[in-house]
């Protein structure tokens, strides 16, 4: 029997509302700043009432970019989308095939290979990133989409999650496929892949956001302004030294940068939650 405790209900709802307010208030301030002009945004204290310059600020960065030596912001959004989508597609493909080989194929040292992949989770990004940059430079892949995406396609986490899921599939599926004369790739495409759709949805959302939010990697790989990404571009808008930061333009760029991942999460919300729940069963 569940006791009805009004004070507990009031307390839990109050904490929930406070938590939502703490999360949403900075976003609201950013939205208000994006609607103001340069003079209004520097007023002390800054107003919390939205202004009328949102479209003007968006048009300014959309056409002129985020600085004097910058590509238009639409180009940065396109670069970020290409990078995030390529990383997502590559991670899922490589991880699924790697996990499939480790679980369903019998070859010497397969467990050793898995643990070699898994142990990379223990290495901080800072330990791996500069050797990776050196490899990319030696392969002449600086200032290219290949340099932006290929090194980030391997994922020990996704490989581990797919391996754990594949290990829950009954052996009868393999036996039935063998009796029907299905090849390994036919078994993968017709049976394993359809059963993995919920896991794919969860990993797609997580990996897309991971790729979209990349900051350090594009900063090290890209010097061509036409290949710049949004996150690195926004950081470049913040002036250093005696320069003045146009915070209204910065916040307008931030709002545009938020739109693609928010759309992905909203569109795939149900599949994302289902994938997380099913992966725990």
Curated annotation (Swiss-Prot):
Q: Where is the ABC transmembrane type-1 domain?
A: 77-268
Q: How does it sit in the membrane?
A: Multi-pass membrane protein
Q: Per its UniProt record, what CDD domains does this chain match?
A: TM_PBP2
Family annotation (InterPro entries): MetI-like, MetI-like_sf
Q: Which GO terms describe its cellular component?
A: plasma membrane
Q: Name one Pfam family in it.
A: BPD_transp_1
Q: Which UniProt keywords apply?
A: Cell inner membrane, Cell membrane, Membrane, Transmembrane, Transmembrane helix, Transport
Which biological process, per GO, is one annotated for this protein?
transmembrane transport
Q: Its domain of life?
A: Bacteria
Intrachain disulfide bonds: none
Task: Give the transmembrane ranges.
Answer: 16-36, 85-105, 113-133, 142-162, 202-222, 247-267
Intracellular or extracellular location(s): Cell inner membrane
* Annotated function: Part of the ABC transporter complex UgpBAEC involved in sn-glycerol-3-phosphate (G3P) import. Probably responsible for the translocation of the substrate across the membrane.
Q: Which PANTHER family match?
A: ABC TRANSPORTER PERMEASE PROTEIN MG189-RELATED-RELATED (PTHR43744), SN-GLYCEROL-3-PHOSPHATE TRANSPORT SYSTEM PERMEASE PROTEIN UGPE (PTHR43744:SF8)
The subunit structure is: The complex is composed of two ATP-binding proteins (UgpC), two transmembrane proteins (UgpA and UgpE) and a solute-binding protein (UgpB).
The similarity comment for this entry is:
Belongs to the binding-protein-dependent transport system permease family. UgpAE subfamily.
Q: What is this protein's record name?
A: sn-glycerol-3-phosphate transport system permease protein UgpE
Encoding gene per record: ugpE
């Amino acid at each position: 029997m569940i006791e009805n405790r009004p004070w507990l209900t009031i307390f839990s709802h109050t904490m929930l509302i406070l938590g939502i307010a703490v999360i949403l208030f900075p976003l609201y301030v950013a939205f208000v700043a994006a609607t103001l002009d340069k003079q209004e945004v520097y007023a002390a204290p800054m107003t919390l009432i939205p202004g009328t310059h949102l479209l003007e600020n968006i048009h300014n960065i959309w056409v002129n970019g985020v600085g004097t030596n910058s590509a238009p912001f639409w180009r940065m959004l396109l670069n970020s989308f290409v990078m995030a989508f390529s990383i997502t597609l590559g991670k899922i493909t490589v991880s699924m095939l790697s996990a499939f080989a480790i679980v369903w194929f019998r070859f010497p040292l397969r467990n050793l290979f898995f643990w070699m992949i898994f142990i990379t989770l223990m290495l901080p990004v800072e330990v791996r990133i500069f050797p990776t940059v050196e490899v990319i430079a030696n392969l002449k892949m600086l200032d290219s989409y290949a340099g932006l995406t290929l090194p980030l396609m391997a994922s020990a986490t996704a490989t581990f999650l797919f391996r754990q899921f594949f290990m829950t599939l009954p052996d009868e599926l393999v036996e039935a496929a063998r009796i029907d004369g299905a090849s390994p790739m036919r078994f993968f495409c017709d049976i394993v892949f359809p059963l993995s759709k919920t896991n794919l949805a969860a990993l797609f959302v997580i990996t897309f956001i991971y790729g979209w939010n990349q900051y350090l990697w594009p900063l090290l790989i890209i010097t061509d302004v036409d290949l710049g990404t949004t996150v690195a571009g926004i950081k470049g808008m913040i002036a250093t030294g005696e320069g003045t930061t146009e915070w209204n333009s910065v916040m307008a760029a931030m709002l545009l940068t938020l739109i693609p991942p928010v759309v992905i999460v909203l569109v795939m919300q149900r599949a994302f939650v289902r994938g997380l729940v099913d992966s725990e069963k």
